[in-house]
Every structure is written in structure tokens, then in C-alpha cells.
């Protein structure tokens, strides 16, 4: 219950308007500010960390099986975006503690792979062709953790331009992953390391470098 003139903080970025209206209607005082729980949730405890490591190990096994299957079957040009996404899900389902996908799989070949947050449907479903780049962005919910992995795969020979761009992205990834930095450094301060190889040839990377991943809670 809200007592008269009780001061209650709400985060306007996440709280439903109903709460603000209810507080005011009950003669409470609304104080706007960031939700203090958000920063606490961003730090995993030791149980969540251990679960995340184990979940990623199992997910990595499923993805390694998928990569082998993809390399063997994609050049036949008989696969389509839905079939490939379903096959990866099957490999994950065969592992332990799998609950569901963590989000709808982004499965895009050729031009579809360049569409941000593309969602394949029966109308847009495209067959994979030799020379295509195929993007798969997917993840799983395991009882002990959550995964999210994105990979760009070549069907046959992707050509010199694709190899060059892929190599530049890899250089940026290695530079960022191996950089030593002092405590307190923010992601935005070292983000340029990932982008520099593309910037050097006048290209802009329009995507974010990385993001956090939650833990499955049921």
C-alpha cells in the first residue's frame, strides 16, 4: 500500500505507465531514476557463471556437429534457410538440459543475410547456392544457462572480396580479444580495435561489437 506522500522511484524506460498513474492517484510522489536492479542483474553469481560455462560447452558440441553437417551438405544446393535452422535445433535438442531456443533463429543466405534481424518465413525462404555467404544467429535455453552465437559460413568459394572482409573482421576480433586494459576500462573505449581494420579501407561496421547474455530462469 502507498502511504500519503510516499516517495517511490520508477524507471520511465521500463515501468508501465499504469504504475505511475497508480502512485499519483494514491497521493504518492513519483521519483524518476534508473532501476537499481538492472546493474545487479548484469553481474552473474558463481552458480550462473558455472552454468553458463557448461551450457556453452554443450552448445559448442552441437554447433561443431552442425558445422560438419553444413560443410558436407550445403554445396549440394539442396538446403534452404528453414532446413538449416531446423537442423541446428535438432543437434541442440540431442544434448543434455536443452529447454528451447533462446530466440527465433536468424537464418539468412545471400542477400537475406544482410537484413538486420531477418526472420525467415515460407515466403522468403531461400535455397543456399554455391558462392553464397550464409548467416546464422541463434541460441539456446538450457536449464543451467543461455547461449547466443552468430557465424557467417561460406557455401563453396565465396570470392576474394568476401575473404578480405572476413579477414578484416577476424583481425578486429583478435585485436579486441587479446588487448590488455586497466581495470575500469569501458567497452566503448576499446571498441575501435574491432573496427579499425575495416575503417582503414573506408568501410563502416554498422553493427554493435557485442552484448550481454542472460541466464535461463525457467
What is each model feature region?
Residues 1-218:
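Active-site neighborhoods and metal-handling regions in enzymes and metal-associated proteins
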